[in-house]
Amino acid sequence: MTTVHTFSILLFFCSLFSASLIIAKVQHHDFVIQETPVKRLCKTRNAITVNGMFPGPTLEVNNGDTLEVKVHNRARYNITIHWHGVRQIRTGWADGPEFVTQCPIRPGKSYTYRFTIQGQEGTLWWHAHSSWLRATVYGALIIHPTPGSSFPFPKPDRQTALMLGEWWNANPVDVINQATRTGAAPNISDAYTINGQPGDLYNCSTKETVVVPINSGETSLLRVINAALNQPLFFTVANHKLTVVGADASYLKPFTTKVLMLGPGQTTDVLLTADQPPKRYYIAARAYQSAQNAPFDNTTTTAILQYKKTTTTSKPIMPVLPAFNDTNTVTSFSRKFKSLRNVVVPKTIDDNLFFTIGLGLDNCPKKFPKSRCQGLNGTRFTASMNNVSFVLPSNFSLLQAHSNGIPGVFTTDFPSKPPVKFDYTGNNISRALFQPVKGTKLYKLKYGSRVQVVLQDTNIVTSENHPIHLHGYDFYIVGEGFGNFNPKKDTSKFNLVDPPLRNTVAVPVNGWAVIRFVADNPGVWLMHCHLDVHIKWGLAMAFLVDNGVGELETLEAPPHDLPIC
């Protein structure tokens, strides 16, 4: 009897294993990086694209699938591809940020990214992680539930990915290179886009405006992705309610809103029901700008939600969007986010970290002419975390240096707290705090460490809403607020029951956010502001997570085709 019972159990688990092998697939894709003529705003320029497409191809996978994407670089720039939000368990070599987990793919060379989607469902995306190439090199990564399972909400009638972006008439690489030379802020974009098109509020754009079809009574799942380089964006659909059901490939307790706010890097899944008169309605996005007196693109991009059998000549209905500086709307929106179910949040903390984030000003070096110091008052713009402006290596990637024990590439003395305590959000910050030190400093974590990070915005130069993205991990946002974080007062307000699970947190302007995660993924993982101008200025750091015990807690060996520097 016991033998038969044991055999039955073994047979059951063997069948489950076999079924999982059948269900899980390996998808193969080729990405050709190339220059492609692209016409926008009445002008044509050569843009860097994937397979000649802008935006690039949408990849659709199931939870549990493996992706193998071979990137062929036929453009003139070095490039890498980052799979934004993918956990990359033990596959850090496939994460993508240049000089962090790999050296860039040189022109004429190729590299294959291979990784498995594990325990994630929803909307993520991929993008270039070199210079400002992600202005046009990006696409959606849609993760469907494992076959046989379903959404935790009624299955929608249709699904549409909507990628919000920015467009420059000039070459974005030239834009950031000029800013780097001069020390000034880069020129702002010329338009925002939805799925690569500015929409008919811009010149020469009406015919190409994106149209999203829908039938009366249908429910559509809109997968909204902010792929803009430097701008948080409000998003809405005229006369329609949006039911938020997910963000960053994690399910949420559904809530209804009229407006979304997404920082660059963030995704939000919403259900929209076609319950209005059958007409044409604008889908619209415009800037949320929290930095005072900073120039920004104050235009509005549109697509059209078009009910079937509606005349295409009728003028779409325009929505009301919040004012560009409406932080109250942003706060009200973000505080509605809660995980779908109660979750296990780390309660005991092993590494309690406090990171200040913000801008800075470097004094003009004596050897520099004035033309290279065009920041405020003859300085050069910079940025930092805990007063350290992050510098990428150039001869080795950080992960390669760590894996091979190469000395002199980085240090592990990134500070756990700012070197000087001050009134972080005050108006009279000492000028002595404006100039950070530069370095390639990592913070070392033991495998399995329970980590809390307080992310504190500062008013150095100006306060601003910063979208902070952590590679290789999701984290729980257990609290957020305004002013200086006060552990005695604010800790008691933490949500340790059902906080949202994200990979990018919008740290409030003149405020703070607290995240928690378990360091269960060995490797070197970048944390940075997803405003690309800020990461260029040094608003970043990296965690070095040690291997654990055994193969399943150890970083995989580097692939044979890993690019060399």
Swiss-Prot record:
SUPFAM superfamilies tied to this protein: Cupredoxins (SSF49503)
Positions glycosylated per UniProt: N78, N187, N203, N298, N325, N377, N387, N395, N428
UniProt-annotated binding residues for Cu cation 2: H84, H127, H530
GO cellular component, one term: apoplast
Residues where Cu cation 1 binds: H82, H469
Binding-site residues for Cu cation 4, renumbered to this chain: H466, C529, H534
Keyword Phosphoprotein among record annotations: no
Residue ranges constituting the Plastocyanin-like domain according to the UniProt record: 32-148, 158-310, 413-549
Cofactor note: Binds 4 Cu cations per monomer.
PROSITE patterns membership: MULTICOPPER_OXIDASE1 (PS00079), MULTICOPPER_OXIDASE2 (PS00080)
Single GO MF descriptor: hydroquinone:oxygen oxidoreductase activity
Enzyme class: oxidoreductase
Keyword Lipoprotein listed: no
Protein name, entry field: Laccase-12
Organism expressing this protein natively: Arabidopsis thaliana (Mouse-ear cress)
